[in-house]
Every structure is written in structure tokens, then in C-alpha cells.
């Protein structure tokens, strides 16, 4: 679970880091990053949901010992996921302006969100491939690579956010554009790391990764039958957040800034639960593949208890040290104090 935790942390570090740095730029940048980032994540969750179906199939083949069947799932899933990414990028490059204009009323927030989003969506080309590599390594239970990848992506993102947003280390001062571009480059570095590691360290022949073959639509449909509901679930969970932020945007920049800060804390708190959920998917699939169906319920009970206890500890820290945690995102005293009550509400919800 720990390497998976770090892998999910790295992906969320991109959004959290953007929020933390832009919080020191101003409320408009913070609000625009919230709207643009959520819109990006809404689309990204479709690919993430698809990768969950691939991960379940890969884990099943791994549990059965049918290692040669893993490669076709990986490569066919990657081809379809990348195709989705290219198609969605093309559509959003054309439709981004009228779509964002429809969703946002403030001209100031609109222009900043549009600037952020049209740079950020280039990350689809890399993020949609990265989710498949994560599915592969979680499915075959070689999760240590996720730790290394997480460190690479987080370091690249933090450094470039600092350099590009504020114009440090010889970079031009790009503000909100810098945050978006830094995130894209971090995702590209993650994909490059996965490719180099896979070809350098993994037995390609054993896992059937040494050949792609022709595009197999039947294989893609099998993955989609498993993942379609997960794709919808993840999309709706993010879409609800986006609708909430749309409502707050109509109340004003201050309310939007507070919501983005508190949501960022919520995302970090949710990572242990997500990592345990991902672990459960893989372990259950491996158990079923190896014939250990009887142990599934006991395993799930153990993971659920662990998840709740971890969340109790995280919530307790937030309740005891709210201002210390929120100060990561802003040095404005009034904004910090106004964010504390919302943080308490989120903490209560996390235990549910």
C-alpha cells in the first residue's frame, strides 16, 4: 500500500502544489486554478477509471500465473487510453473557450481559468499513458517503482512551479501559465521514467510486453465492460465538486479561494483511502485468480478497519493544528482564519 500511496500522492501533489504556490499569488489565480484544475481532473478521471478495469484484468492474470496474457491487456489499454487523450485534447482545444464562458460568470476568473486550462490539457498526452503503467505495476504487485516515479514527478513539479510561477532560476515569470506548464512537464517526466524503467528492468518476454500486435477491439471492450461503471463513478464524483465550485464562483473570489484551499486539504486526506482501495482491487483480483475466493471478505474487513483508523489520525491532526496546515496555502491571515470552519466540516465528512 505504501508505494501506491506515494504514487497517488505524486499525482495529487501536482494539484496541491499548484494551489499552495498560487495561493501566494492572489485570489484570482487561486480561484482560476481551482476551476481549471477541477475541469482537467473531471476529464482525467475517465482515463483513471478505465485503468482500474485494466488493473483488475492484469491482477487476475497475474494471480492465475498467466503472465503472457498481461502484455496484451497493457498495450491495448494504453493504445485506447492514449487515443482517448488525443481526442479529448483536440475537442477541448476547440471547445474550451465557449465551455468555460458558459460555466464562469466573472470575466477576471474566466480569462485566468482559460489561460490555465488551455495549457494544462496538454497533460492528457502523458497522464492517460501514466495511468496504464500504474495499472500494470499495481496489477503485477511490483509497486516499488511507483515510489521512485512519485519522487521524480513531485520533485519536477515543485521545482518548476516555484521557478515558472515566480520567475526564479532563470525562468520567466509566468504566473498561472507557469503552474499549468510545470504540471504538464511533470507528467511528461513521469511517463518517460515509466518507459525507461519498464524497458530497463522488467522481463518483457515473461509478461508479454515485447510485442504489441494489431489493435484488438475485443480486448478493449472487455476492459470497458469492467471499468465503465468505475469511469462514470469517478467522473461524477469530480463533476459534483465542479458544480459546487461553479456555485461558489458566483458568490465571489474570496469564497472560491477558501473552497480551493480546503478542497486541497481534503484531497491530501483522501489519498490513504484511495491507496487502500487500489490495494484492495489488486489483492482481491490476485486472490480470485489463485483460487482464494474464501479469503476475500476477511481481507476487505481488514482493509476497511485500517482505512478508518488512518483517517481518524489524519482528521485529529487537522482539528488540532488547522492553522498550521492551512498556512501552507496562504500567508493572508484573514483568508486563513475564514478557511478554518470549512476545514472542520470537511474533517467530519471524511470520517463518514
Language-model segments: residues:
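Small-residue hotspots at the loop-to-helix junctions and early N-terminal turns
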Residues: 27-38, 113, 117, 180, ...
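Generic alpha-helical transmembrane segments of integral inner-membrane proteins
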Residues: 5, 9, 13, 17, ...
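Small-residue-rich hydrophobic transmembrane alpha-helices
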Residues: 19, 30-90, 127-146, 240, ...
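Short alpha-helical transmembrane segments in multi-pass integral membrane proteins
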Residues: 1, 58-125, 171-228, 284-349
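Transmembrane helical elements of multi-pass membrane transporters/channels
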Residues: 3-15, 119, 153, 186-190, ...
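Short runs within selected transmembrane alpha-helices of multi-pass transporters and secretion channels
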Residues: 51, 55, 120-139, 146-157, ...
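Helix-terminus/linker motif at the lipid-water interface of multi-pass membrane proteins
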Residues: 9, 13-31, 100-107, 163-174, ...
